[in-house]
Amino acid sequence: MGIPGLEGLHTWISIPFSFMYIVAVAGNIFLIFLIMTERSLHEPMYLFLSMLASADFLLATAAAPKVLAILWFHSMDISFGSCVSQMFFIHFIFVAESAILLAMAFDRYVAICYPLRYTILTSSAVRKIGIAAVVRSFFICCPFIFLVYRLTYCGRNIIPHSYCEHIARLACGNINVNIIYGLTVALLSTGLDIVLIIISYTMILHSVFQISSWAARFKALSTCGSHICVIFMFYTPAFFSFLAHRFGGKTIPHHIHILVGSLYVLVPPMLNPIIYGVKTKQIKDRVILLFSPISVCC
């Protein structure tokens, strides 16, 4: 494992990667703590945000420690079982986070298009949606394990990546079933999530532009700004990595594939808490209130 062609730069690459991982862990843990301890934030929008922060923390932690071990200590060995486990958890968390982003889009859709029905999104309903996202992700990703273990491996044991991806490429047999299942999952789960998110925001825009007041329009759309930024950050590098690996061929240098894949598990988890902290007034106000006693004491 590692980043082929950039071995001499591993130490330098580890510096920004370490910074991003520390910020991602600290930011998401703080966001979860803030939402769980502030009763005024116990609303559907923020409960979904706490789920997103949990998924971001887990996604970064599933990959980053091994990436940093490779970059720092040249610890490039990993057992097959550990590699499969890492692959499973990265895919599992990705699919679950995609479902959470869809749930957040639905939350904004109901809040803006049907505000009088927004009370249907109780804390109990939010918990059920969260459980459904986890269960869906589990059943989608479990077959990956069986598909990997069913293959025959003939001694090739080098994964040209900073974490465990594309394990099936090490097999010496036919991997068409694995490829077809991977494409099917990408299209029918994550792809469907994206389509439903687009539909939700199309309906939101339709409702917003029926409002005569520009101030009211801006206020309605401002509640969606953070979510839209997070959606673009989550899906864009993921699909670039997914499509470049399958169709990029030799047009994109291999180390670019690996760097984008590595940044994908660090940059969104790092930036999501910052985006919501800056763009969401309620969270910004609570952060200021939380630290104001410290400022007074100093």
UniProtKB/Swiss-Prot annotation:
Q: Which InterPro entries match?
A: GPCR_Rhodpsn, GPCR_Rhodpsn_7TM, Olfact_rcpt, OR51/52/56-like
Q: Does the keyword Flavoprotein apply?
A: no
List UniProt keywords, sorted A-Z: Cell membrane, Disulfide bond, G-protein coupled receptor, Membrane, Olfaction, Receptor, Sensory transduction, Transducer, Transmembrane, Transmembrane helix
Return the protein name.
Olfactory receptor 52Z1P
Location (main, coarse): membrane
Q: Which residues lie on this side of the membrane: Cytoplasmic?
A: 36-43, 107-128, 200-223, 279-298
- What does it do? Odorant receptor.
- What gene name is listed for this protein? OR52Z1P
The organism encoding this protein is Homo sapiens
- Cysteines paired by S-S bonds: 83-164
